Structure formats: structure tokens, C-alpha cells
Amino acid sequence: MHKLNRYFFVLVLIALVALPVRPQLSVKPNAFKRDPSSKALKWANEQLRKMSLEEKIGQLISVGVNATFLNQDSDDYRALKHQIEDNKVGGIILFRGQVYESVILVNRMQELAKYPLLISADLEAGAGMRFESTVNFPWNMAVAATGNPEYARRQGEITAREARALGVQQIFAPVVDVNNNAANPVINVRSYGEDPADVARFAVAFTEGAQAAGAIATAKHFPGHGDTAVDSHRGLPEINVGRDRLNSVEFVPFKASVDAGVGAVMVGHIAMPQIDATAVKPLPENLKSKPTDTDEAGEIIEEKAAMPATMSPVIGNILRKDLKFPGMIVTDALSMSGLTIYFTQEEAAVRALEAGADMLLKPADADASFRGVHEAVKSGRITEQRVEESARKILAAKYDLGLVDQRITPIDTIDRIVGSRDVPALATEIAEHAVTLVRDEDKLVPLKNLKPGSRVFNLAVTNGDDRAWIANAFVTRLARGGVKVETIVLDDRSTDQEVQKAIERAKTADLVIASLYGRVRSGQALSVGVPEPGARALSALITAKSPILGISFGNPYLLQGFPGLRTYLVAYGDMPSLQQAVARALLGEIDITGKLPISLPGLYPRGTGIQIKKTSHR
């Protein structure tokens, strides 16, 4: 009997030893510093001495994936596995996906990779921008509307903390573009505003918060995407200004970010003809990559254009030598039409390296990008030492991020870190301090003068495919405060009958709320605008002099298209925190203190904001 017990004990012990050791994420990752440690450089150099040319090239490429569930026999999984095992790519950029599916997929790729992968994501508005069921922070312009950079710092810290818990080490944020063009279709509320010094203050705060929490922050989109009227997902934007103007406006927040130690800078597909006038022409259709980032409206093709910044050694030298940036330079996605209209993926990859880039982000065809660089080295167009220079930066960053010791993200810590109470609390706090009352000629705000039983009609207009739920957070919170509203949502599919019904219902209401969801929608022709059916209905109600309370849950410049709105309130986004904050402001439950970080040309200057004290103590 004793022998049997001893035998059983030995079997159990063997089984326990055989179990894989699950690495635990440290309570707080070490702060990331741009200058690599001596240990990181030593390790990077040791790897480079052992690497083949192909492995060195692979380190420079970061491929994109929507982090959803992928069966191991699926085409998408096989394609990703091919990049990891055959091209030895150095990183992955994550797009929309579920939390656990994302981490499991990344962990599997980390296991397959010979060298640790650097995982990145666009987390400008927090983890919720890419991971389902996590919290979205308000857009940068809302953060700036509070006037308090400490919110940006706290947002950066929380974003990095959640990113690391989700297996992401590099954040493609903050956006440091100065949005001084009201017609900008892609930056808009993603910017901290139009004042270079203010943008710099908030960008530096976010950067310091994020890197203190152990992630690489990435200032984007150099040399500046704010004064453009073309979305680089659809075409090549141009900023036709000279160096003096760039030094005093566009470069200010980039220089401040560099001085603050930002780890990376993303260069955008932006033409600067007064800086680099080298002409580029569209490729023949048979050589172009298929557009991946545009809607049915298609690409915007300029027959005569100047060299994109991502391909320009002149602009690369400004960043390296004039702004003295020694860190990692990342291209904007090489799949974007602002680049693919003019360059093949092979040529784009080589030119990006010639322009000073270190990371080749999301090629439309990673095999082609790899092949292009490989052939350029073999032909002598670029040297292997040039490839090593960028690979060294990326490898050293991986070491200092702790990926050499621990590349696998523990699953069991995610629900203790991601979405903790301080995350929605901060989103709510920012939102409630951001709400901006620009105009209130009829004294409609707050709704204290609304009589019991009054009919309130909400005309919601959206530029998204979300009519079934887009206004829910707003109207639900109003109802909790005792204001019930009838809502009709109009979008670009709305019929004439639906428009007429909305107009008729509005005309019988005691108060009309016009909720305008004209949001940034990258690659979409209607980005930051409102669809024609909704615009037609709102214009008819303004003409009929209906009592209208206009709210922008997105683009703050919409008042320019509807100057007849006598009351206009700006929330800068459609996040639940912002919709609920507006509802609370209308109910008189919170102070209204936000101020415009931008001017509304011809209407209101930057800094406008009517201050109203709360009237309710709920």
C-alpha cells in the first residue's frame, strides 16, 4: 500500500513539473526610455551577429491583422504564420478584435517567432479603439477642451497599462497634428486643437504618462497632417507651406515631443512641395495595390503630386538632424492610397528606408516589401549596415520592453487590469469637463424651463451604419433624468418618406434636439460630414424656426454648415461617456465648463465656451 502511494505521488510530481510555467506580468512594467540601455544594445548586437540578411530585413516589417478568432487551417491564419515563420517579420499591428482572441492569437505568434514580436496598435482613444468590450476615452480634442493636460497624462498612463496587459507594447499615439483646417476629413477631433503650444502641452503629457507605464508612445503624423483637406487613406494630401511656417506651427508639438523623450515618430503620407518638390506620378493600374482603406467613393488621384514625406530623405533629415530625433521612425501604413497610388510595395519599402524609416508598417503586400528590400541590398542600392541600423533600434526596444525575458502575455491577469474602475471613471471625468456650449441664444440649456409633459423630439443624424443604436446612450441617460424623447435616426440610406416623417414629428414637438453624429471615418467620403437626408431635414426645421438645440457628437465645425442653429453644444465624439455627459449637462446635473480648442472660422474664436453652473444636485 505504501509503495502504491509513493508511486502515485511520484506520478503527480512528474505531472506538475511537466506543466508549462505561466509567466506573470509584473505589477508595473518598467518605464520605457528612448535611449536604449547598455544591456539592450549588447543583446541586439549579439543577435545581429547571428542573424541572416533575411532575418534582419524581417525585423523592420510589421504586418497587420484583425485580431479575431482564427482557425489554424484558415487562410488568414496561414498567411500570418507565413509572415512570422518565413519572412521573420518583427512585429504585428492589431486592428479591431476581441480581448481574449487577440491575446491568444498574439501569444501563438510569439511562440512561433524566432525573435520576440513588437506588438502595436492605434490606441489614440484608449484600448476601446481596438479591443471590443473595453473603454473608449474621449477624443483628444475633448481632452483639450477641458484645459487640463493632467487628463492626457492619466489617459496615457492607463492606455499603456491596459496595452501591456493585452500584449501590446507600442501605442501609435498621441496624434500631435495641429488641426488648423476646418475641412480636414481625417484628423479633426483626433487632434488636441489648432494652437501649436496647446497641442504640445497635451501631447507631452500623454507621452510621459504612457512611457512611464512601460509602453512606447508614437507621435504622429510627421511633418503634420492638420492643415490638409484630403484623407491620406484615399489620396495624397498636400501642405504647401515653407519652412518658417512649419517651424512655427506644424513642427512645434513634434519638437516638444522629441525633447520630452518620445520613443517613436510616425511619418505620414503627406506632400510638402516647398520642402521636397520631387514630382511623382500615378502608377499604371496593373502595378497598383488594390485599395484597402477606402469606401465605394474610391481614391483621390492627383496626376501631378510631390514626394510623400514617408519617401522623402529631405523630410527624414529634418526629423533626424534638425529636430534631433534619435528614436524609432515608423511609416504610416504602406497600404494607404496616399502611397499606393504612386509606388509599388517593393519600391515604397526601399524608399522609406532611404528616407530614414526604421519600421515598415502594414504593407499591402509584405512579401513584396520584403523582396524589395532584399533586392535593394543585393544590388547595392542600400547597404546591409543600413538595415542593421534600424533592426538594432527595434531589437533594443524589445529588450528594454522586457520581451526577451517574457514575450507571452498571461491570460489570467487581463480581467484584473483591463477595465478596472479608474478607467471608466477617468473617461467620465474627462467627458464631463469637455462639454462645450458655444451658443445659446434662446437659453435652452439646461432644460430647466421644460414644462412637465413637454414633447421632446430627437433628430439624430449619423454618417455611420449604426442607426439602430447610435443615440441610445444619450436618450437613455436623458430618460433617467426624467426627460423622455422620441428619436428618429437619419443616415445616407434614409428615404424621402423617412425625412418627411422626421420633419413632421419635429414640427409638433415643444423642443427639437438635433444630435449630429458627423464623425471621423477614415477612408470614407462622408467622413466628418452629415448625410444629405439628415442635412435636408435639419435645414427645413431651421427655416421653419423650430426651437432647436443642436449637439455635435463629433465634428465641432458642423455649425458652419448650419449657422441658423441658435443653440449649439459640442461633445467632440460619440463615446458613451460623452453622450451621457451631454445628457447630464442638459439635465443641469453637472457644470458646463468646456472651451473650444479650435476656432469656428467666421463664427467663434478658439477658447469660446459659455460657462453654466449645475442646477440639480442629483
Question: In which residue ranges do the predicted regions lie?
Answer:
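Bacterial N-terminal signal peptides
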Residues: V10-A18
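Second-shell residues forming the walls of enzyme active-site clefts
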Residues: R49-S52, D76, I92, E101-L117, ...
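Short glycine-enriched loops at secondary-structure junctions
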Residues: N66-F69, A121-M129, Q169-N179, A219-H225, ...
